[in-house]
């Protein structure tokens, strides 16, 4: 039996309104809103304003990270959401971003990361047998 340690969503968003992705304050608010909406835990963040247009930013999470890089002059934003906090939280963070940015087109890749074996817990009988050997 195996389990996946994390889920990674890479999304290219096209047809995003210029004003939604041009300013670093809006980009910061977007990612922080996604973190809160998904119930993720922020460790730190870094954001940068480009001139004449665009912004980039990343929030480091206890569960991994969420990032954005924008080209508002092309109506384009590259989004990266990777968490080990459960698939639901990863999808919720992306759902929030899509609701706010309302892209006309989305190209998305979803990857399960870190598939590892799951060891079953020994039953009570197996524990007794191991202790008496």
From Swiss-Prot:
Origin: domain of life: Bacteria
Report the pathway entry. Answer: Amine and polyamine biosynthesis; S-adenosylmethioninamine biosynthesis; S-adenosylmethioninamine from S-adenosyl-L-methionine: step 1/1
Residues annotated as the enzyme's active site: 64, 69, 84
Tell me the Pfam families matching this sequence.
Answer: AdoMet_dc
Required co-factor?
Answer: pyruvate
Task: Name any one GO molecular function.
Answer: adenosylmethionine decarboxylase activity
PANTHER family in UniProt: S-ADENOSYLMETHIONINE DECARBOXYLASE PROENZYME
Q: How does it assemble?
A: Heterotetramer of two alpha and two beta chains arranged as a dimer of alpha/beta heterodimers.
Q: HAMAP family from the xrefs?
A: AdoMetDC_1 (MF_00464)
What's this protein's name? S-adenosylmethionine decarboxylase proenzyme
């Amino acid at each position: 039996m195996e389990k996946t340690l994390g889920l990674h969503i890479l999304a290219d968003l096209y047809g995003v309104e210029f004003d939604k992705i041009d300013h670093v304050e809006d980009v910061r608010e977007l990612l922080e809103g996604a973190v809160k909406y998904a119930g993720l835990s922020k460790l730190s963040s870094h954001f940068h304003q480009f001139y004449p247009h665009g912004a980039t930013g990343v929030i480091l999470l206890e569960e991994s990270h969420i990032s954005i890089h924008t080209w508002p002059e092309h109506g384009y934003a590259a989004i990266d959401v990777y968490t080990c906090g459960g698939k639901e939280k990863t999808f919720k963070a992306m759902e929030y971003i899509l609701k706010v940015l309302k892209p006309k087109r989305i190209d998305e890749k979803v990857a399960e990361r870190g598939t590892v074996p799951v060891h079953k817990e020994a039953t009570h009988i197996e524990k007794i047998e191991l202790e008496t050997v």
